[in-house]
């Protein structure tokens, strides 16, 4: 086993068995228990189409329910960098489009956005792009 953590307010334990292999052990209190999981992907945090309010509602509900959060990836678009041929000033949220430190701003803002939910995250995948 590589690592193991037990978030203080969750009914599960996440163990990292290998770099890309995790197990989640859920501690059921009875035979008729319910466990919640928020499965998400493609949040594209820096996209103007990313609904931060909806994401916050879902993440808040996950915390309230003690849910495991699994993010399959593509947390960022990151297509508005100086050297990216796909970049377009219309495809970037205004708070990230105003300065030369776009990548740092996106990563720091996303880290701040997700930090309150970190104890419930099982993993965050890389995504497909």
Indicate where each model-derived feature is located:
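Short glycine- and acidic-rich boundary segments immediately preceding or forming the N-terminal edge
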Residues: 1-27
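Core catalytic region of metal-dependent phosphoesterases/phosphodiesterases
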Residues: 5, 31-34, 40, 45-129
